[in-house]
């Protein structure tokens, strides 16, 4: 417990809210170029080969972003749009690639939840 004199000398500092996606620099999305596309394995109770990409952003950051959906066409030098949103079982992956924009095509044969995977309405 501080004394009144200590509180006069320097006041209480409000706790700072840290952003969960610093590479976006307070923007909703950022564009970037894939530097490496690879698969990685998730944390302990889960088992899979998760598709991720190392992306160099226009903000200067290099981040790891998750590629959602089944199958993708991304390779090195692909231009992608990323949004915030972590993948719980992949440590260090705090961003998602947005499907259906720039070089990332939408998921093939997707009929439900299409808006999340960049798929147009089937005729």
UniProtKB/Swiss-Prot annotation:
Part of the 30S ribosomal subunit. The keyword RNA-binding applies. Residues 1-20 have a biased composition (Polar residues). GO terms for cellular component: chloroplast; small ribosomal subunit. This is Small ribosomal subunit protein uS12c. PROSITE patterns: RIBOSOMAL_S12 (PS00055). It is found in: Plastid, Chloroplast. GO terms for molecular function: rRNA binding; structural constituent of ribosome. Its main location: plastid. Keywords: Chloroplast, Plastid, Ribonucleoprotein, Ribosomal protein, RNA-binding, rRNA-binding. It holds the Pfam family Ribosom_S12_S23. The gene is rps12. With S4 and S5 plays an important role in translational accuracy. Located at the interface of the 30S and 50S subunits. The keyword Nucleotidyltransferase does not apply. InterPro entries: NA-bd_OB-fold, Ribosomal_uS12, Ribosomal_uS12_bac. Belongs to the universal ribosomal protein uS12 family. One of its GO terms (biological process) is translation. It comes from the Eukaryota.
